[in-house]
Amino acid sequence: MSSAGRVKERTRLDPRIIDDKLAGLYHKGQDRIWNGKEYLQECLDKHGGINIKTNNVEALHNIFMIILWGELAAWKISASLATEIEDDSARMAATAQAHDEARHFYVMKDYLELLNGNTTKEDLNKHADRFLSYILDANHISKKLLGMQMMVEPLALTLFRIVREKDVDPVLSDLLIMFERDEARHVAFGTLHLPSVLRKMTTPQRVDLWIWQFRGYMKQFQILYSLEESFEQLGIRPRRVYEAARKKQLNAINIMADEMGIQYPFIDAMMRISDARYELGTASEDRPYLQRIRRATEKVLA
């Protein structure tokens, strides 16, 4: 087997432990179900309705339209995984996630309709639409797991945390606490189950997955670039969003590797190239292009 396609084995957890953890995600989801419509109304009553500066409405809408349609994509993918996955415990985890994503979608839709009344897909950022379609159209379980649990979910968690810390709207901040709690379980699903899928894949399939993942990361950049003005309007540094999302995505991959006893190939090189790509593409920092090239080169050679 070539080094490009090999997944190097280290100490592996007992499969029974993994099964218990996956089944545990299902039971935790059942124990922590919340009624989205009731909770949204409680938040509205608590804070006297949505309370946001008028000049921030469009920026917040731009960001959370991506979250809305990302939740729908996650709902569709997790429901699909629940029928495609053969392992019973993993199927339970996927089923629990589908329930969570359905709730997130309708709650966010209700919130955005209260914010400015527009939630049609025609108003969705075109780069986000392309990225989500890229994952929805994936032709293998590994791509759906990796794309949703290790790319989309960490980015969503990053946006939840940063926007909540800014407290742009107290109602949204309270909603995001509940969203974050659910989404953390979804990342765990990916870190626990993806390694067992990888072990069953052929070398060409693994290489195809790494290439697909890299292309997905590049598509994410277009989303972040397109939102830079919206971030700045809300007082959020675009670079902070990139760095925080990068950290969460890398952490998810490392947890997967450590828990399952594998060494994930190419990740260091992929992150260096990603950092360089960000330096070249961001328009939020006023730097001469030659300085951008220098910084990008430093990232690649780091």
Q: Where are these predicted regions, by residue range?
A:
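Short helix-loop-helix connector
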Residues: 85-86, 164-168, 180
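Terminal targeting/low-complexity segments that flank the catalytic cores of oxidoreductases
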Residues: 1-92, 113-129, 138-143, 201-204, ...
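Short, charged, amphipathic alpha-helical segments
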Residues: 92-96, 174-177, 207-208
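Soluble, non-transmembrane catalytic domains of enzymes that act on hydrophobic metabolites at membranes
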Residues: 168, 191-196, 200-207
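Hydrophobic, aromatic-enriched interface-forming segments
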Residues: 172-175, 182
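All-alpha helical catalytic cores of prenyl diphosphate-utilizing isoprenoid enzymes
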Residues: 115-132, 137-167, 172
